[in-house]
Amino acid sequence: MLDDDLPVWVPIPALAEIQIALETAVANVTELEGFELKRIMRTGTVATIDNRNWELREHSGPVQRLSQSRAIALDMESATIAANGFRFRVPYGTLLCVSDKPLHGELKLPGMASDFYKTQVASHLRIGIQAMEILREMPLERIHSRKLRSFEETAFL
């Protein structure tokens, strides 16, 4: 639906300002730092795909493209948030709670995921709220990223 505004071949960059706020919030909530923090958290670009059942079919093509893109995860909803944030020049970011690894033969089934969600949802909510509080305290000019500007737009305000 957004292909005219943002073709599928256009990468949507991760915004460092948002990632730093999320990483700070994760460190505060989990009380981890250094390698221990990096062990549980990855930051970067999240890719998407237009086929919800891609992992159930032959997927060597999508896997190769995703690997070459250096994406750290695949998520349809995060892509929608990023695409619209990018399109409307609104800072964007998502905090994903990874509960399945389809490429490793670990599909998320309803019963298998319930324990994971019980333990993770509350901490992710605290992390999200704290990240928004960190961002709220930042001056607007710091939150606004140059990555939200296109090639034809002036690089500086």
Regions found by a protein language model. Give the residues of each.
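Accessory terminal and edge-of-domain segments that mediate assembly/interaction
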Residues: M1-L157
